[in-house]
A protein has these predicted regions:
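Bacterial Sec-dependent N-terminal signal peptides
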Residues: 1-26, 243, 322-324
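Subset of outer-membrane beta-barrel
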Residues: 23-324
C-alpha cells in the first residue's frame, strides 16, 4: 500500500506541474493537511471528533502596492467546524472565510454534509456542500489615468451568489485520499459595467497523505495537495508537497514545497491533557516570482477538539413538575 501511495503521488505531481498559477477564489493554505473540510466536504466527520478551527494567513508580508498606500498583501481569515454523526453514518461541517487582496474582497459561508460508508479496510465518504459566495471590489483604491471617465465605476460594489461543491473521500487509520470540486455551478458576477462579467473558476482538488510510524513515539506524515482550475477556457494547476514529523502525538514540525512558488516550514504543539488544543504556525519563503512578491508569508492555526459525549450516561431530564 505504501508503494501504491507514493506511485500515485508521483503521477499526480507529474501531471500537475504544467503551470503554477492558482485562482484566488479559494485562498491557499500551507497547513492544508489540518483543514480537510475546507478542501473536501466529504471529509466532514472523518477525524472522529468535533473540531473548531481558526486560521489567519498573511500573504507576502510587507508588500507595498504602487496604486494605494494602505497595503495590497493578501490576508485571509478562515473558521471551520465539523463533527461526526455516527448514529446516521454521516458527518457535517461548516466553514467561512474572509479573503482580501488589494481592492478585491472574497467571502463565503459553506455547509457540508458527508455520508460515510464503512468498508472492510476503511471508510468511503460522499459529500456535498452548499452556501453563498460573495465578491466585492473597492474602486476607490484605483488610480485611473482618466478619473473623469464616466465608464469607470466608483465606490464599493459587491454581489453574493449561491455556490455548490462535491467530493469523495476515503480514509483509514494509516492514509487518506480525496477528490473534490468547488464552484460547480460557476456563478457569475457583474462588478461594474455590464461588460465586466466575472465567473468563478471551477476548482478541483486532490488531497492525499500517509501516516508512517518510524519509532515508539515518532511518526511522519507525507502529504500532497493538487489544485486544478478552469475558467473561460483557461486552465491552471498547483502542487504542494509536505512532510510533517510528530513526537509523542504532541509536538510536530515539517517542511514543504509549493511548486515554483515557495518553501514552507510548519511547527505546532497539541496542548491539554487530551491533546485537544492545537496551536500551529507556518512560514513561507517565496522563491518564485520574487520580482512582484514580498519574500515571506505566514499562517497561524488554532483548533480545539470537543470531548466526545458519553452515551453511557443518561441525561438528566428536568420538568416544571419534578425539579431535582
Amino acid at each position: 500500500m505504501i508503494r501504491t501511495f507514493y506511485a500515485f503521488a508521483l503521477v499526480v505531481l507529474l501531471t500537475g506541474v504544467r503551470t503554477a498559477v492558482a485562482q484566488v477564489e479559494d485562498p491557499q493554505l500551507s497547513m492544508y493537511m489540518y483543514n480537510p473540510v475546507y478542501y473536501n466536504p466529504a471529509a466532514a466527520g472523518s477525524e472522529g471528533v468535533s473540531r473548531l478551527q481558526l486560521v489567519q494567513r498573511t500573504q507576502y508580508v510587507g508588500y507595498t502596492p504602487t496604486i494605494t498606500s494602505d497595503g495590497g498583501a493578501q490576508s485571509t481569515q478562515l473558521i471551520s467546524f465539523n463533527m461526526p454523526l455516527a448514529g446516521i453514518k454521516s458527518g457535517i461541517g461548516i466553514y467561512a472565510f474572509n479573503d482580501r487582496i488589494g481592492p478585491i474582497t472574497n467571502q463565503t459561508v459553506q455547509a457540508a454534509y458527508a455520508y460515510r460508508l464503512a468498508l472492510k479496510s476503511g471508510t468511503l465518504a460522499l459529500g456535498v456542500q452548499a452556501g453563498f459566495y460573495s465578491k466585492g471590489y473597492d474602486y476607490g483604491q484605483l488610480r485611473p489615468g482618466e478619473p473623469a471617465d464616466p465608464l469607470i465605476p466608483t465606490g464599493q460594489i459587491s454581489q453574493a451568489r449561491p455556490d455548490f461543491g462535491a467530493g469523495v473521500y476515503y480514509n483509514t487509520t494509516d492514509y487518506w485520499i480525496g477528490v473534490s470540486m468547488k464552484h460547480i455551478n460557476q456563478a457569475s458576477y457583474v462588478l461594474g459595467t455590464d461588460r465586466s462579467v466575472n465567473p468563478l473558476s471551477r476548482n478541483a482538488f486532490l488531497t492525499a497523505g500517509y501516516r508512517l510510524g518510524i519509532g515508539y513515539d515518532i511518526d511522519v506524515q507525507p502529504s500532497v495537495l493538487v489544485q486544478y482550475s478552469t475558467v473561460g477556457g483557461v486552465t491552471s494547476s498547483n502542487v504542494s508537497l509536505n512532510l510533517v514529523g510528530t513526537y509523542a502525538n504532541r509536538i510536530w514540525a515539517g517542511v514543504g514545497y509549493r511548486w515554483q512558488d515557495a518553501l514552507t516550514a510548519t511547527a505546532g504543539i497539541n496542548l491539554l491533557r487530551d491533546n485537544s488544543l492545537r496551536l500551529g504556525g507556518a512560514f513561507d519563503f517565496v522563491i518564485g516570482g520574487t520580482q512582484i512578491k514580498s519574500a515571506t508569508s505566514y499562517e497561524i492555526l488554532l483548533a480545539y477538539a470537543f470531548p466526545a459525549l458519553d452515551s453511557r450516561k443518561k441525561p438528566i431530564v428536568r420538568t416544571p413538575r419534578f425539579r431535582y
